[in-house]
């Protein structure tokens, strides 16, 4: 008889045989509402949920704020002599009396809480937070969503390492800048902004400790329309190793002191509604400054929208050199592929290239310069071309270009929308007819998976 069979017949409860501290750790990984339901299992489990140092609660699950406060106070009272690890509170209903909730949040913060998340799901429900939040010596991470942040007399968050500020309102222009600068060991910052009259148009991020920065503005989700040139982003973070910019509103991006090992994910449009706006020197100047600020990057992922603007910029201005760049993942509109050699020429040490092709050629065929970029002759080892839609052969012309001109190429991969195995086989056979500059190159064709 197997041991498992014996256990099943004896009805042994392995979970309940664990010590309390392990059970508490298991319960802390559940939403509090689920953890509380375990109290009906037995006398031992009745109050076990109160020993979990995490409160993850949705106020909407309670009949009213008074019921919630009664429940939450009971929970906090169980931590009078110990630290609360995490408080995650969310709500949506407008009936919530925040002036009842705020003192309770203050009480929780005084228990030397390490992680705090306040998530309002209706517009700017929380008009203020207790001052203890901004003076906490214990907070390690802070996430605020739809919160009104007023002018701070004093802010000090000496141990805060992670901060996510999402769709909040800042009553004064310097509020966010002061907030960020008051976190001397901040490593991870996310800022999601709205496009409205209340949002400060110039965002300045200055930090000597920041490692990861994500900035987001999506004007398509906002009712307010502002085509002014006042929206700007200024970044000075010399320790930054990851930068994500998803911004279709800001006109200008000034990036200072980016380190040589940094990686970036870029999707910006400089608030350009018409590509011909780049005929103006002011618009081109903003693009040029942005590219110069990114020129020390090691690894970049760039959107088709941003690359289209850069390609038009290159018809008028030279591209700065990205000498540290070893990996580039780019979405390229096929109508802009004639500028690809120019982009590659600016990356003389590129080792890995991923191109995802978008759009269709209308009447003309793609024309690539006969001049071979330096990286193809000396450093480019891996190339992947992705063609999600069945095109008119641009991916094959591009494949031929790389196979015939890349001297040290080791791996070439074509990911294409093939309707059948037979069509996939035809693509392989055509690729094998192309002359290969690198005899060591391995060719791989895979079907694009939707």
From Swiss-Prot:
Residue ranges constituting the F-box domain according to the UniProt record: 12-58
Keywords recorded for this protein, A-Z: Leucine-rich repeat, Repeat
Placement of LRR repeats on the sequence: 157-181, 294-317
FBD domain span: 364-416
Domain of life: Eukaryota
Entry keyword Repeat: yes
SUPFAM superfamilies the record matches: F-box domain, RNI-like
Protein name from the UniProt record: F-box/FBD/LRR-repeat protein At5g22660
Source species taxonomy: Eukaryota, Viridiplantae, Streptophyta, Embryophyta, Tracheophyta
């Amino acid at each position: 008889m197997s041991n498992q069979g014996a256990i099943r017949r004896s009805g042994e409860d392995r979970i309940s045989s664990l010590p309390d501290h392990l059970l508490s750790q298991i319960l802390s990984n559940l939403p509090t509402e689920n953890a509380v339901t375990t109290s009906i299992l037995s006398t031992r489990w009745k109050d076990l949920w109160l020993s979990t140092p995490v409160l993850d609660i949705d106020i909407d699950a309670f009949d009213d704020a008074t019921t919630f406060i009664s429940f939450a106070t009971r929970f906090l009272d169980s931590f009078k002599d110990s630290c609360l690890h995490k408080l995650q509170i969310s709500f949506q209903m407008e009936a919530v009396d925040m002036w009842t909730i705020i003192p309770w949040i203050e009480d929780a913060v005084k228990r030397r809480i390490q992680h705090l998340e306040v998530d309002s799901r209706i517009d700017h429900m929380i008009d203020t937070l207790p001052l203890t939040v901004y003076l906490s010596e214990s907070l390690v991470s802070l996430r605020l969503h739809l919160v009104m942040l007023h002018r701070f007399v004093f802010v000090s968050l000496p141990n805060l390492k992670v901060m996510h500020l999402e769709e909040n309102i800042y009553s004064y222009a310097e509020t966010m800048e002061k907030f960020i600068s008051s976190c001397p060991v901040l490593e991870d910052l996310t800022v999601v902004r709205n496009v409205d009259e209340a949002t400060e148009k110039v965002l300045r991020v200055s930090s000597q400790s920041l490692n990861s920065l994500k900035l987001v503005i999506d004007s398509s989700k906002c009712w307010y329309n502002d085509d002014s040139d006042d929206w700007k982003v200024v970044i000075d973070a010399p320790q930054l190793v990851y930068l994500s910019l998803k911004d279709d509103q800001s006109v200008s991006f000034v990036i200072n002191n980016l380190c040589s090992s940094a990686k970036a994910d870029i999707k910006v449009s400089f608030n350009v509604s018409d590509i011909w706006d780049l005929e103006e020197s002011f618009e081109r100047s903003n693009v040029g400054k942005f590219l110069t600020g990114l020129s020390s990057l090691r690894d970049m992922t760039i959107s088709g929208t941003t690359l289209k603007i850069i390609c038009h910029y290159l018809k008028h201005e030279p591209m700065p050199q990205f000498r540290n760049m070893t990996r580039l993942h780019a979405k390229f509109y096929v109508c802009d592929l004639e500028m690809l050699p120019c982009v590659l020429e600016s990356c003389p040490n590129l080792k890995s290239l991923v191109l995802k092709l978008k759009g269709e050629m209308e009447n003309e065929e793609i024309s690539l310069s006969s001049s071979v970029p330096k990286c193809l002759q000396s450093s480019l080892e891996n190339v992947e071309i992705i063609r999600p839609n069945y095109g008119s052969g641009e991916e094959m012309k591009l494949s031929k270009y790389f196979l015939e001109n890349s001297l040290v190429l080791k791996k070439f991969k074509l990911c294409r929308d093939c309707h059948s195995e037979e069509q996939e086989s035809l693509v392989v056979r055509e690729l094998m007819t192309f002359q290969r500059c690198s005899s060591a190159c391995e060719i791989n064709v895979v079907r694009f998976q939707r």
